[in-house]
Amino acid sequence: MSGHSKWATIKHKKAATDAKRGKIFTKIIRELTIAARVGGADPNTNPRLRTAILAAKGENMPNDNIERAILRGTGQLEGETLDEVMFEGYGPGGVGVLVQVVTSNRNRIVSEIRHMFSKNGGNMAENGAVGWMFHRKGDIVVPKEAATEDKILGIVLDAGAEDLRDDGSAWEVTTPPEAMEKVRDALTAAGITPASAEVAFVPQNYVKLSGPQAQQMLRMVETLEDHDDVQHVYANFDIDEKEIQAAVAG
């Protein structure tokens, strides 16, 4: 199963009491701005913006902050010029890594991302070298305590999901990109709150890691995710949940 979705679930729980909430706000504001710039300010016709607004409200972001971010995206409010960039690379053990960045300084971020790869046993790669290892899918993670397998399976398959996987402490639901919102809304209507729901780059296969390589890989992901300009990190590692919990606790 996907060790990376376990990481996302455990990190989500930790973030609720973490000093990193300010960074979460910054990342969501940038996503709102980019989503509005690319697809317009109307969430009814812009699925990416709809998802970003839901994420903002899930973090109790004030409506004024949401509206200002959208207005900056459409150019109605002045703000920094942001570029969206995807970097590709390899982590320990040949794990494929995609790093989605929103930045106001493309030259600076290239050198910083390269440094974060190299100091954690990895290296950056050319465009296309790693991207083929992933496909774009809806990815919904539901804590196991929220629902039984039978209950969640019936809901998500009826709503258009492709797959449900047991990922240790969570259920991982995979959907076509265009069905993600429908599946998420079906879960919510049934009283089931996902830990996360997004259109993501989901690995087509996984690289099993343990011991020092696993710890080094998790340090790389955490270092990348902590950077203000990094929106998402996708990686095809499979690491035992106990090792992930130990890394987060440490």
Task: Name what the model sees in each region.
Residues D139-G250:
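Positively charged, low-complexity, intrinsically disordered RNA-binding extensions
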Residues M1-M116, G121-A125, V130-D139, K208, ...:
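N-terminal cationic and glycine-rich segments that engage phosphates or anionic surfaces
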